[in-house]
Curated annotation (Swiss-Prot):
Residues 328-451 are cytoplasmic. One of its GO terms (biological process) is monoatomic ion transport. Glycans are attached at N105, N174. InterPro entries: GABAA/Glycine_rcpt, GABAAb_rcpt, Neur_chan_lig-bd, Neur_chan_lig-bd_sf, Neur_channel, Neuro-gated_channel_TM_sf, Neuro_actylchol_rec, Neurotrans-gated_channel_TM. It is found in: Postsynaptic cell membrane; Cell membrane. It comes from Homo sapiens. GO terms for cellular component: chloride channel complex; dendrite; GABA-A receptor complex; GABA-ergic synapse; nuclear envelope; plasma membrane; postsynaptic specialization membrane; presynaptic active zone membrane. It catalyses: chloride(in) = chloride(out). This is Gamma-aminobutyric acid receptor subunit beta-1. Disulfide bonds join C161-C175. It comes from the Eukaryota. The chain crosses the membrane at residues 246-267, 271-293, 305-327, 452-473. Beta subunit of the heteropentameric ligand-gated chloride channel gated by gamma-aminobutyric acid (GABA), a major inhibitory neurotransmitter in the brain. GABA-gated chloride channels, also named GABA(A) receptors (GABAAR), consist of five subunits arranged around a central pore and contain one or two GABA active binding sites located at the alpha and beta subunit interfaces, depending on subunit composition. When activated by GABA, GABAARs selectively allow the flow of chloride anions across the cell membrane down their electrochemical gradient.
Amino acid sequence: MWTVQNRESLGLLSFPVMITMVCCAHSTNEPSNMSYVKETVDRLLKGYDIRLRPDFGGPPVDVGMRIDVASIDMVSEVNMDYTLTMYFQQSWKDKRLSYSGIPLNLTLDNRVADQLWVPDTYFLNDKKSFVHGVTVKNRMIRLHPDGTVLYGLRITTTAACMMDLRRYPLDEQNCTLEIESYGYTTDDIEFYWNGGEGAVTGVNKIELPQFSIVDYKMVSKKVEFTTGAYPRLSLSFRLKRNIGYFILQTYMPSTLITILSWVSFWINYDASAARVALGITTVLTMTTISTHLRETLPKIPYVKAIDIYLMGCFVFVFLALLEYAFVNYIFFGKGPQKKGASKQDQSANEKNKLEMNKVQVDAHGNILLSTLEIRNETSGSEVLTSVSDPKATMYSYDSASIQYRKPLSSREAYGRALDRHGVPSKGRIRRRASQLKVKIPDLTDVNSIDKWSRMFFPITFSLFNVVYWLYYVH
């Protein structure tokens, strides 16, 4: 019951207040009040000297900064810069622009800003900037009764961002926006972030194709020059590069091409056309990938992380091609030469043996000792005797069927005994040699070279990848 009566009394009291507000708003739009506003603005601008800062000769002017980041359009590694679009607002107090009698803020035409004093703010690391002008110049000037001035601009700036690309593309970059007074020192003007941590907004809404904004910081400081100390505000963005694009465009193709080069180890070694074509194709493809990557990056003096990976892949591909060159040399070059030389030596030895084993006989069947050599070993020396008869008719017989018996000397008997006792030692040597052949591949066997390459290349490439990713990925 009492609650209903209280509500009715509040309604009766608030009704006159609402009527008063409506009347005041209506009176503001009346021609007499519009003329008063016009007279107030004319009075403020009349005699206003834009050449002098507020409170000239007194304390420095405090200028507050606010930034609403609209977008980060591009981050370029080639030019070492980034493009930022923002709503940049500055506020300060100018007692010459204070007014009374109008309980409203005056938002004026953007051309009025040319008739008022504004801070000489500039971006220190700016390369190219402009104020948007569609459909009109995007700037705002707003006056408050106490003389506070709010000056806003919509700006797109391309600012320098010096990047360290040693860990590219697994890197993080810090790009800053430096705001400074060009002419006024700290004796005349002071900069501060208006709103503290909330002075910069819109950063969390930004999405970049190749980067993620991990964090941002606001810094206020003073810098010393020969002409004095100047105020500076710094907005720093910490950008982390997204690796997904580079995995699909660079790392995965390079890895697959490297693996493709190993297919030649399973192709027959006498298929020269297939193996050479595969090796050259993979080498040229790796060269193309490296060239395309260099075109998208600046010419810097140090080695980047992606350069190390591409260089490693190129080395593996090139070694696969050299492996076939080695196999080809063993099979078609050095191997046949050795076989030909051994065959020639063997045929020469057989020919000498045949000539030594041939005897000559005359027509009566008498053996002529013109070419038969009788070797007698006595007291560690050889006695060679030969008799010849040039008049006899000669027939050649193989002396392999002729057997000569002679008693064994003590030296020969001792040598045969040593041979019989030496057989086990030779067997042990052969077994050790066979064990060594299992451990050490025969580099003269082309099949063995390909077989070992099938294991060596994948293992070493996998080890290279493990070391690379463990080092560069945190």
